[in-house]
Amino acid sequence: SPAALQSSSFGSAGFGSTNFGSSGFGPSLGSTGFGSAGFASPGFGSPSLGSAAFGSSSFGSPSLGSTGFGSSSFGSTSGLPYLVVIPNNPAVGGLR
């Protein structure tokens, strides 16, 4: 039923804090974005979609959320990311 899907699968246990959350993708898509342990911190970065989501380390700085998709490798500091090819940038497999 809709209630079962909401609370168990997509809510706090399934999609949120347990499965999609803390260890794998971060404390749900709301709290800490996509990341925390799995998607975020080391690989993809820091505050973006939620709090520790897509940006900083590999993909960049202020763009989508807070420090999101852009700057360093992929984008800008204005709004939507745009592709910037940066040679010698191992984060995006740049030329060497």
From Swiss-Prot:
Residues 11-74 are annotated as: 9 X 5 AA tandem repeat of G-S-X-X-F. One of its GO terms (molecular function) is chitin binding. The N-terminus is blocked. Coiled coil: none annotated. Residues 75-96 are annotated as: Disordered. Sequence repeats lie at residues 11-15, 16-20, 21-25, 30-34, 35-39, 50-54, 55-59, 65-69, 70-74. One of its GO terms (biological process) is biomineral tissue development. GO terms for cellular component: extracellular region. Keywords: Biomineralization, Chitin-binding, Repeat, Secreted. The gastrolith is a unique 'organ' that absorbs the calcium in the outer shell, allowing the shell to soften and break when it is necessary to shed it. The crayfish then re-absorbs the calcium from the 'gastrolith' and the shell becomes hard again. This is Gastrolith matrix protein. It comes from Procambarus clarkii (Red swamp crayfish).
